[in-house]
């Protein structure tokens, strides 16, 4: 018999395995661990519960969490509360799709491959680029991979990054760069945008590329046309990290001449989930096609002339070239990419534009309300769905108070930047109502 209900190994199985490897007992397997630190007591566990009782207890624990179903969320900074069409979960739950792994066998994976191909097509169209890959882990790693590509392509070992790029993405880039012996220089932010004069001074012959966020971490829309001219005059690459939803209204980076556009498609069909897993995207111009990291799905025809989909240009990848690959990314976020594809397809072009417009309109309404109530709102009105409000109290204290009123407050900018202590980054998406926005502004009156 098995010793444990959920472990199929019997005592005889255990004995046979120990005999094969030449030890007498399970304890002998752990002889390298000093005796004094081995756990030998009984586990102090509560008595077993029935499944209904266990579900009740877990539900009670889960109810302690603040969620965006019952709370009005104004928290963004890279992860947002957006409308997710009901059909998304139905499609991604199908057994044919329910994997995050790469479909290596095209003959049995046409549905999955076509779904990825559609994701690539929609991302390329949104960003205004020639092609996109099948997805990355998230926006931060996609940005870092873009910088590695720029360095490899230009044979230069220095990357410039705007101080208005999300600090976490910037930190991911610095981590990647350390292993590749690439220098990263941060161009300071000025009034919520990249300091253009500082960028001009920093550009030199050893700069592989410049990274900018559009809209940036503070919600501001960067002047890509001006930045593109400066960067390309230096024969460097322009790398843009973008919120794909904003591109329903804003001019795509590709139309400004961006070389690489990356970001996170969490805004389409993927819940916040405490920060992940999400889905990065990576789009480039044709000249960089053979240096793209990750999978690429291409459309072809079989011997009968029927349309089919396959993984293409695989010679770039680590399972083929090992240490000479363009990147060490192996799998991708296929399931989350599918969720984004279904969400975008469900919205359609008109729906996506409407969703973006609601973000723009509602966030500008909120900013207007803050100003009417006498709050100091920073920077220009050129933003998409996030802006910065200065308060008189610590943001952590304010947010704890807001929770009591059923509101999830904005992001504490002082966490990363001392000069922005008591400054809140407010995100307003299409999910927020006029009543919720008004209540949020009213709740902050005491912290004005």
UniProtKB/Swiss-Prot annotation:
Q: State whether keyword Oxidoreductase applies.
A: yes
A GO molecular function term, named singly, is: glycine dehydrogenase (decarboxylating) activity
Q: Which cysteines are joined by disulfide bonds?
A: none
Asked if Oxidoreductase is a keyword of the record, the answer is: yes
Source domain of life is Bacteria
| Catalytic EC class | oxidoreductase
Instruction: Supply the alphabetized keyword list.
Output: Oxidoreductase
Q: Which reaction does it catalyse?
A: N(6)-[(R)-lipoyl]-L-lysyl-[glycine-cleavage complex H protein] + glycine + H(+) = N(6)-[(R)-S(8)-aminomethyldihydrolipoyl]-L-lysyl-[glycine-cleavage complex H protein] + CO2
PANTHER family, from UniProt? Answer: GLYCINE CLEAVAGE SYSTEM P-PROTEIN (PTHR42806), GLYCINE DEHYDROGENASE (DECARBOXYLATING) (PTHR42806:SF1)
* Similarity comment: Belongs to the GcvP family. N-terminal subunit subfamily.
| Role according to the record | The glycine cleavage system catalyzes the degradation of glycine. The P protein binds the alpha-amino group of glycine through its pyridoxal phosphate cofactor; CO(2) is released and the remaining methylamine moiety is then transferred to the lipoamide cofactor of the H protein.
* Protein name listed in UniProt: Probable glycine dehydrogenase (decarboxylating) subunit 1
Record gene name: gcvPA
């Amino acid at each position: 018999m098995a010793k444990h209900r959920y472990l199929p190994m019997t005592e005889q199985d255990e004995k046979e395995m120990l005999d094969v490897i030449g030890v007498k007992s399970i304890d002998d397997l752990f002889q390298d661990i000093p005796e004094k630190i081995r756990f030998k007591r009984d586990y102090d566990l509560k008595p077993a519960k029935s499944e209904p009782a266990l579900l009740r207890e877990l539900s009670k624990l889960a109810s302690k969490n603040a969620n965006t179903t019952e709370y009005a969320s104004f928290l963004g900074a890279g992860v947002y509360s957006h409308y997710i069409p009901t059909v998304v979960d139905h499609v991604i739950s199908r057994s044919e799709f329910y994997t995050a792994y790469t479909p290596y066998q095209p003959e049995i994976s046409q549905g999955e491959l076509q779904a990825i191909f559609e994701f690539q097509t929609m991302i390329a169209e949104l960003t205004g680029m020639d092609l996109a890959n099948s997805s990355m882990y998230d926006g931060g790693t996609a940005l870092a991979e873009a910088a590695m590509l720029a360095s490899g392509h230009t044979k230069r070992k220095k990357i410039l990054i705007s101080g208005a790029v999300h600090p976490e993405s910037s930190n991911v880039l610095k981590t990647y760069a350390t292993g590749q012996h690439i220098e990263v220089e941060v161009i300071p932010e000025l009034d919520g945008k990249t300091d253009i004069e500082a960028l001009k001074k920093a550009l030199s012959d050893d700069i592989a590329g410049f990274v900018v966020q559009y809209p940036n971490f503070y919600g501001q829309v960067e002047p890509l046309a001006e930045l593109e001219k400066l960067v390309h005059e230096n024969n460097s690459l322009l790398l843009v990290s973008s919120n794909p939803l904003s591109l329903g209204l804003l001019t795509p980076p590709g139309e400004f001449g961006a070389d690489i556009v990356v970001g996170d498609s969490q805004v389409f069909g993927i819940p916040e989930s405490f920060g992940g897993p999400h889905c990065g995207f990576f789009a480039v111009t044709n000249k960089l096609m053979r240096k793209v990291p990750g999978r690429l799905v291409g459309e072809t025809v079989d011997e009968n002339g029927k349309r089919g989909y396959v993984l293409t240009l695989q010679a770039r990848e680590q399972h083929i070239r090992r240490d000479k690959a363009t990147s060490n990314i192996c799998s991708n976020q296929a399931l989350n990419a599918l969720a984004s594809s279904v969400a975008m397809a469900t919205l359609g072009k008109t729906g996506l534009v409407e969703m973006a417009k609601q973000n723009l309109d509602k966030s500008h309404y909120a900013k207007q309300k803050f100003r009417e109530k006498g709050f100091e709102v920073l920077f220009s009105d050129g933003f998409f769905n996030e802006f910065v409000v200065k308060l008189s109290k610590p943001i952590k204290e304010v947010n704890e108070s807001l929770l009591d009123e059923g509101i999830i407050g904005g992001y504490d900018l002082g966490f990363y930047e001392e000069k922005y202590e008591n400054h809140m980054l407010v995100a307003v998406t299409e999910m927020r109502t006029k009543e919720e926005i008004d209540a949020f502004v009213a709740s902050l009156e005491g912290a004005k």
